């Protein structure tokens, strides 16, 4: 009888010990599991915040890249390039191209520091950029003191391209009458520009991969450049082709300059003005 009671007490104590150990083990494992889950949740939340922050930074970088792309290329061309990865070169039957440069720029550069020249070009072309936004034109490029603008490309605008370019040219020449060099210049430099304009066909397309540029090619570009280089300071020099287009509008005053040799050929050229500006003489 005593042996049975002793065995029963032993069994009960063993059962109780097992239950206590199981309870403690369960508590420890549950606590460990909760701690692990909590740490894992914290890591996931932290990772999610990192991803969110990186996504935000990526979005900002994407917008900056798009902004830079739209500054380098016409908007419709940049959009097509972004969507398809390539843009086919196009032929344009008639566009108008403007070239301008600073008269005696080389001489001015010889008596100025490089920083002064950079200040001058940044200041001057910043003003030009503000003015071209008023017209249906596209700034193709600036190389040194040369400034190139086109109208009728890449967006067609009928026969209005010549008028837009001529109005811009008049606006720029009027701007130069009031222009003062930046404060970095110790002496007052008189800055004049000469402008050359020509109308005709051209081919336009994207050139380059790392730094893509929208470039124009053809004799029209070359002739417009010659119009500028054979022009006079403070005047707007345009070819007879452009003259024929703006003559139809009846709003411009032109003066025949005569026959000028342009790229080994003869071309009739005129200077231009309108009723809002002082008449220009040839």
Specify the residue positions occupied by each region the protein language model found.
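Catalytic/regulatory signature loops of cyclic-dinucleotide turnover enzymes
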Residues: 180, 198-199, 219-240
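Regulatory cytosolic signal-relay segments
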Residues: 21-92, 177, 251, 279
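Catalytic core of nucleotidyl cyclases, primarily class III adenylyl/guanylyl cyclases
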Residues: 100, 131-164, 178-221, 245-247
């Amino acid at each position: 009888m005593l042996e049975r009671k002793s065995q029963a007490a032993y069994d009960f104590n063993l059962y109780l010990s097992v239950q206590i150990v199981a309870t403690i083990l369960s508590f420890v494992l549950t606590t460990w599991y909760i701690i692990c889950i909590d740490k894992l949740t914290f890591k996931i939340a932290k990772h999610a915040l990192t991803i969110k922050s990186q996504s935000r930074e990526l979005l900002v970088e994407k917008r900056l890249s798009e902004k830079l792309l739209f500054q380098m290329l016409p908007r419709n061309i940049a959009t097509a390039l972004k969507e398809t990865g390539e843009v086919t070169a196009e032929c344009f039957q008639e566009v108008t191209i403007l070239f301008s440069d600073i008269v005696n720029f080389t001489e001015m550069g010889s008596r100025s520091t490089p920083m002064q020249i950079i200040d001058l070009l940044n200041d001057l072309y910043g003003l030009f950029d503000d003015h071209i936004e008023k017209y249906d034109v596209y700034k193709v490029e600036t190389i040194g003191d040369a400034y190139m603008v086109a109208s009728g490309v890449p967006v067609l605008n009928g026969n209005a391209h010549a008028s837009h370019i001529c109005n811009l040219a008049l606006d720029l020449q009027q701007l130069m009458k009031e222009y003062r060099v930046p404060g970095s210049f110790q002496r007052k430099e008189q800055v004049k520009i000469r402008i050359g304009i020509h109308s005709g066909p051209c081919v336009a397309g994207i050139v380059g991969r790392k730094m893509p540029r929208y470039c124009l090619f053809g004799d029209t570009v070359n002739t417009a450049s010659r119009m500028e280089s054979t022009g006079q300071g403070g005047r707007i020099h345009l070819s007879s082709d452009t003259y024929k287009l703006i003559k139809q509008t009846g709003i411009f005053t032109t003066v025949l300059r005569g026959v000028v040799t342009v790229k080994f050929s003869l071309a009739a050229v005129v200077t231009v003005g309108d009723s809002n500006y002082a008449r220009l003489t040839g």
